Design a protein with these regions (language model features):
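Short helical segment in ABC ATPase nucleotide-binding domains corresponding to the A-loop/adjacent helical element
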Residues: 91-99, 109, 217
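Helix-to-loop junction immediately C-terminal to a conserved catalytic motif
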Residues: 56
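Hydrophobic anchor residue at the start of the ABC signature
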Residues: 142
């Protein structure tokens, strides 16, 4: 790896409500290396998405700090829903982020269309979202994010709205795209299989308030696709270890 791109140092977060103070995150410490794919798993509602909001700077931690040791890091965010606008064509949807930032040029448009063609959507530029499959829509959402050339991708359960077969296929494709484009990724999910099949490391969070219970390095070749990983003995072993940790 090439050094830490992101560090969370003793990060805690409290919410103040009429009922009192609620602790959401407790003393989180971990880093993400440049070029690494890290997954965070934990029970639903444990604070995984809350952690992403701190990384993006939408909220500030109550204590501790989120740092970027190599300087400011351009980030992209991929959500559970694709949020494509139904009245815009695929090409115009993917250019939306560039439009909002007033960065649409012949060069940026050409680069974006090249990404669509490279990853199998070149024949659908004039199609509308309603004419696309769920997997195609979510892949378009990823390319919309990549069009802004982020260095760090934050993936917030990006496959959870899809059927199981599409999820498996799309995870393979998204993994390949992220590797091919040389991006760093932080995935949050409650799906253990998804985490083990895609990541270099898995961070296991406790129930709320989220603490880091365990960090597991996955001893599989970094470029092995997710579907191929699922057939290995190492996949079964890591899955069982994480499941055991979550049940404690």
């Amino acid at each position: 790896m090439n050094g830490a791109l992101l560090c969370l140092e003793n990060v805690s977060l409290y919410y103040h409500t009429p009922q009192g103070e609620t602790e959401a995150l407790r003393d989180l410490c971990f880093s993400v290396e440049k070029g690494e794919f890290v997954a965070v798993v934990g029970p639903s509602g444990c604070g995984k998405t809350t952690m992403l909001s701190l990384i993006m700077g939408l909220n500030a931690p109550s204590s501790g700090q989120v740092t970027f040791p190599q300087g400011p890091v351009p980030m992209g965010y991929m959500l559970q829903r694709d949020n494509l606008l139904e009245w815009r064509t695929l090409e115009k949807n993917v250019l939306l982020g560039l439009e909002v930032q007033h960065k649409v040029t012949e060069e940026s448009r050409g680069r974006t269309v090249a990404l669509l063609k490279k990853y199998g959507l070149g024949d659908f530029l004039s199609h509308y979202p309603g004419q696309l499959s769920g997997g195609m829509r979510q892949k378009a959402a990823l390319i919309r994010t990549l069009a802004l050339d982020p260095e760090l991708l934050l993936l917030d359960e990006p496959f959870s709205a899809l059927d199981y077969q599409t999820r498996l296929t799309l995870a393979d494709e998204v993994f390949s795209i992220i590797r091919a484009e040389g991006k760093t990724a932080l995935l949050v999910t409650h799906d253990i299989g998804e985490a083990v099949s895609m990541a270099d490391r898995v961070l296991v969070f406790s129930d709320r308030p989220a603490t880091l219970k365990r960090e597991i390095s996955l001893d599989v070749p970094g470029n092995m696709p997710p579907l191929a990983r699922r057939e290995t003995n190492a996949f079964q072993e890591h899955f069982a270890a994480i499941w055991k940790e979550l049940k404690r």
